[in-house]
């Protein structure tokens, strides 16, 4: 999770005069962990659902509410900067969305510049999915001349000096030779045009999402900055821009809007229009265990730096500031109410319910499945439900499709919820290549599919998967294992030929069966040699996956 470091003096400059001991007590109550501290500074880890707390300005803003210094939604004036930027159609297939804003009257020190860079990189991880979804550029506005153009250029179409370099390079050379270009080349390599932001004179500000130009590098003398946010998700782009702008405004900066001319219309950004959400007083009381009135709910929401108004004795409308991108549901408001009341003051209680315990039906079935697999000589493994598109799709030779993505991943290896167990088993083989053969492993676990009709827009399915690797693993062996598994579970089954990208053509089969109370379906076969190679394995692999419907 993201960790930020700031001095106690930083908080004092932002209106928080608090002794160290009290600060160490208060911060965990706001949803953070204290990583380290000394006489001058503190290192704090915040949960990734609160990207607005990834800067010391955001922390101070929240602290002022928690401590009762200020209540209600902060007000930010946004004036028209007169700056325009045009989004050219040539960039729509690469990185179509752009947000831009001007911040004036900024004051930088060497320490502040470092904090800004750390803030930027934390947002790249938490919202930007390591720049794939969102990338940020911050520039010295006085070094360039508007209006600006966001367009796609050919790999050898222009030269400019990238940040912290002395030589001009083409976009292609940056991807091949510059350290940042090499690290993020995969984001652009499949495209024949690369995004570029240029000014009126053709000078290059940035090559999103790779690197800024040296021309607009921030210094302690910078007084006006231009913030650009590009990405593949318009909502995430606007949210990121709002968080950055309001953070600078907390430090005394003045926000100027930019006219963004897109092919589908014009808009002025940032848009700091708040949104409203209703919360039930009785529901908040039930969830928290507190006896709350509408007035108390309003007061607690205002401590959370929102505005609130009562519409009835049992309903309050919360007015949510644009930088609070974590508020998605009524229960999020209830969480904020509990935090502002101080979670540590809420007494835990045992539920006043008398029941006779009984083992869940699926738990009994789950135990039977494991017993069958162990009896067949398999060893159980447990992998994480979170995986990545690289492992789940590309290494398995699968086309990407609808999936549940992690909105604010803390690692590029954990960006989605799995839809299959097989790649996890192959990763286990990859990590245990040094062990003796044969290796026979299985896993029983949940996967998640998109389901627009459900309340959560998702559907949880339990699957069984097993895999075997040794020098002579083949279709006959996995067919026998599939039959043994299904028969021991009490099903009659039928087998039909199946083509599956992860398996060798002609050596994969679908399995369908009907039981007394449920149905199962799945497939098995010899894993494709390309998949075996993708996981750096040296011997054939056979695998089975069954879904319990």
Curated annotation (Swiss-Prot):
Any one biological process term the GO annotation gives: phenylalanyl-tRNA aminoacylation
Cofactor(s) needed by this chain: Mg(2+)
Catalytic activity: tRNA(Phe) + L-phenylalanine + ATP = L-phenylalanyl-tRNA(Phe) + AMP + diphosphate + H(+)
Coiled coil: none
InterPro entries linked: aa-tRNA-synth_II/BPL/LPL, B3/B4_tRNA-bd, DNA-bd_dom_put_sf, Phe-tRNA-ligase_IIc_bsu, Phe-tRNA-synth_IIc_bsu_arc_euk, Phe-tRNA_synthase-like_B3/B4, Phe_tRNA_ligase_beta2_arc, PheRS_beta_core
Protein keywords: Aminoacyl-tRNA synthetase, ATP-binding, Cytoplasm, Ligase, Magnesium, Metal-binding, Nucleotide-binding, Protein biosynthesis
Boundaries of every B5 domain copy: 272-348
Pfam family, one: B5
Location in the cell: Cytoplasm
Residue numbers binding Mg(2+): 326, 332, 335-336
A single cellular component GO annotation: phenylalanine-tRNA ligase complex
SUPFAM superfamilies attached to this UniProt entry: Class II aaRS and biotin synthetases, Putative DNA-binding domain
Keyword ATP-binding included in the entry's annotation: yes
EC numbers: 6.1.1.20
Family: Belongs to the phenylalanyl-tRNA synthetase beta subunit family. Type 2 subfamily.
Subunit structure, interactors included: Tetramer of two alpha and two beta subunits.
Entry protein name: Phenylalanine--tRNA ligase beta subunit
Species annotation: Methanothermobacter thermautotrophicus (strain ATCC 29096 / DSM 1053 / JCM 10044 / NBRC 100330 / Delta H)
């Amino acid at each position: 999770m993201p960790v930020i470091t700031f001095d106690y003096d930083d908080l004092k400059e932002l209106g928080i005069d608090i002794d160290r001991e009290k600060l160490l007590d208060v911060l965990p109550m706001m949803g953070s962990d204290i990583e380290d501290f000394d006489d001058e500074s503190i290192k704090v880890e915040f949960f990734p659902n609160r990207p607005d707390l990834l800067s010391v300005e955001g922390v101070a803003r929240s602290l002022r509410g928690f401590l009762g210094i200020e209540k209600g939604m902060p007000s930010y004036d946004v004036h028209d900067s007169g700056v325009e930027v045009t989004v050219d159609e040539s960039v729509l297939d690469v990185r179509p969305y752009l947000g831009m804003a001007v911040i004036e009257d900024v004051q930088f020190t060497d320490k502040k510049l470092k904090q800004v860079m750390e803030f930027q990189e934390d947002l790249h991880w938490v919202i930007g999915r390591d720049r794939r979804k969102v990338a940020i550029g911050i520039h010295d506005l006085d070094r360039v001349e508007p209006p600006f153009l966001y367009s796609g250029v050919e790999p050898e179409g222009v030269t400019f000096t990238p940040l912290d370099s002395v030589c001009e390079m083409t976009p292609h050379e940056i991807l091949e030779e510059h350290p940042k270009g090499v690290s993020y080349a995969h984001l652009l390599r499949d495209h024949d045009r690369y995004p570029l932001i240029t000014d009126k004179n053709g000078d290059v500000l940035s090559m999103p999402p790779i690197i800024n130009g040296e021309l607009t590098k921030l210094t302690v003398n910078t007084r006006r900055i231009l913030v650009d946010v590009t990405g593949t998700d318009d909502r995430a782009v606007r949210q990121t821009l709002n968080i950055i702008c309001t953070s600078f405004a907390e430090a005394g900066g003045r926000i100027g809007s930019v006219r963004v001319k897109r092919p589908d219309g014009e808009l002025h950004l940032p848009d700091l229009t708040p949104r409203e959400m209703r919360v039930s007083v009785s529901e908040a009381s039930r969830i928290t265990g507190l006896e709350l009135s509408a007035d108390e709910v309003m007061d607690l929401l205002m401590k959370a730096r929102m505005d609130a108004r009562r519409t009835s004795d049992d309903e309050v409308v919360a007015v949510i500031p644009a930088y609070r991108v974590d508020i998605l549901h009524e229960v999020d408001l209830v969480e904020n109410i509990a935090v502002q009341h101080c979670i540590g003051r809420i007494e835990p209680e045992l539920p006043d319910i008398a029941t006779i315990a009984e083992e869940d039906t699926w738990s009994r079935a789950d135990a039977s499945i494991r017993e069958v697999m162990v009896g067949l000589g398999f060893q159980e493994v447990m992998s994480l439900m979170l995986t990545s598109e690289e492992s789940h799709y590309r290494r398995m030779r699968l086309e990407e499709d609808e999936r549940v993505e992690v909105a604010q991943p803390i690692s590029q290896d954990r960006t989605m919820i799995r839809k299959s167990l097989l790649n996890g088993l192959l990763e286990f083989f990859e990590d245990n290549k040094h062990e003796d053969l044969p290796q026979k492993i299985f896993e029983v676990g949940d996967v998640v599919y998109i389901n627009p009709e459900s309340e959560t827009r998702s559907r949880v399915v339990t699957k069984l998967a097993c895999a075997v690797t040794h020098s002579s693993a083949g279709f006959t062996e996995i067919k026998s294992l599939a039959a043994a598994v299904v028969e021991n579970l009490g099903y009659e089954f039928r087998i039909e030929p199946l083509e599956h990208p992860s398996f060798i053509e002609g050596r994969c089969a679908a399995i369908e069966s009907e039981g007394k109370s449920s149905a199962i379906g799945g497939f098995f076969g010899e894993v494709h040699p390309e998949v075996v190679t993708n996981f750096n394995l040296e011997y054939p692999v056979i695998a089975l996956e069954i879904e319990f419907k």
